[in-house]
């Protein structure tokens, strides 16, 4: 579906700095560096974090992750969080769904020996951060309306190939619907492919959430994500700790996943 129509077939390499991002990440993988993924507490940020960590861990990378807490930390990068990641050995930080306005924090990261690759979909400021920036609004990319997980999906695609990246298309689809970006062009294709995967073989955490919400065995549509799954995945980040949704999307123990799903269902 992604390649069926010309208007849906933008190469990830058309995004400004994508080649630089790929080169820096490949260098980190080759040198066994510790890579930190810095996300956000909403569905887009959480799924973007899971997507990129899944890909990097499948490549054998040593990874850290940081998802801010809405109340305690607020949105975006913070020097304290960056310092904490550096103290744990990270020499490369990749942001997902955030970072495009974090000029000061990115300068701080450079000052303590950490390279930064920003992947974000929000409107860029007049002065871009002094680092590698992958954003569909910057440069000549043909479709500016990707969500954060859509950008992360394109990064995974650039690092490998389309077939490998399609293993994470379910996450990009959930984020695309939940983040309320236009369901046209590439987004339409991402959601179509992602729904097919979700209906055929949902992640254990998604299946647990569907059971908890009384939707087991029912087909998933974009409306299901928008009004059922999305709000439940957002509940942790809105009220307490987005790591609950992260654990749900990355876990495999059915008993633990059921408990997390029930908690998110209750909080929603």
Residue locations for each model-derived region?
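Conserved phosphate-handling catalytic cores of large alpha/beta enzymes
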Residues: 85-88, 93-95, 100-181, 187-190
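Hydrophobic helix-and-loop "lid/oligomerization" segment in the mid-to-C-terminal part
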Residues: 1-92, 112-113, 160-268
């Amino acid at each position: 579906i992604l390649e069926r129509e010309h208007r849906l077939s933008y190469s990830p390499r058309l995004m400004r700095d994508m080649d630089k991002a790929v080169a820096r990440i490949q260098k980190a993988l080759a040198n066994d560096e510790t890579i930190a993924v810095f996300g956000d507490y909403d569905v887009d940020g959480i799924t973007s974090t899971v997507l990129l960590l899944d890909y990097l861990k499948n490549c054998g990378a040593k990874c850290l992750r940081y998802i801010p807490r809405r109340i305690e930390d607020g949105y975006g990068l913070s020097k304290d969080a960056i310092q904490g990641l550096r103290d744990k050995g990270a020499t490369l930080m990749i942001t997902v769904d955030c970072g495009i306005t974090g000029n000061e924090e990115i300068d701080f990261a450079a000052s303590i020996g950490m390279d930064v690759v920003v992947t974000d979909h929000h409107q860029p400021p007049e002065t871009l951060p002094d680092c590698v920036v992958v954003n569909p609004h910057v440069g000549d990319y043909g479709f500016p309306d990707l969500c954060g997980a859509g950008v992360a999906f394109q990064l995974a695609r650039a690092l490998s190939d389309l077939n490998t990246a399609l293993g994470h298309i379910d996450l990009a689809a959930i984020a695309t619907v939940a983040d309320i970006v236009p369901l046209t062009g590439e987004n339409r294709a991402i959601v179509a492919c992602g729904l097919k995967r979700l209906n055929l073989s949902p992640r254990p955490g998604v299946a647990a959430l569907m059971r908890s919400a009384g939707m087991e065995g029912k087909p998933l549509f974009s409306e299901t994500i928008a009004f059922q799954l999305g709000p439940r995945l957002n509940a942790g980040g809105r009220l307490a700790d987005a790591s609950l949704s992260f654990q749900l999307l990355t876990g495999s123990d059915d008993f633990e996943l059921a408990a997390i799903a029930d908690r998110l269902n209750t909080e929603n």
